[in-house]
């Protein structure tokens, strides 16, 4: 697992936490760590093998907890916090935010209130006229979402 993949996992973790409405300061700490990891010149795997936790903590934004998660990620390909979070909020919910008009709050509403947790679920929801029931989605946003799902002709 390279630095970019590790950074991507922390960006995803922060996004899932944002969807759940977790503490904004915690989200920011994961995003800051991800930004630093993404551009760090030395592979984190190398640092972890040679210097352990202390070496990883030398990276700006990486404290003891995040360094521990990096080591877990390198050893197992995942970490406990990720497993726990994705058990409650599937990773596929992140795909919803790739669509125009759907940010973290709307993704959270779709998932929590309407049990939409993937693009497939959203297509069925939209085809059944579900967007009109979602607070915060007006006609223009609904149209953007339909167009991006290629459902505007239905």
Regions found by a protein language model. Name each.
Residues 1-22:
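Charged, compositionally biased N-terminal leader segments and the immediate start
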Residues 33-154:
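Accessory alpha-helical DNA-binding modules that contact the DNA backbone or grooves
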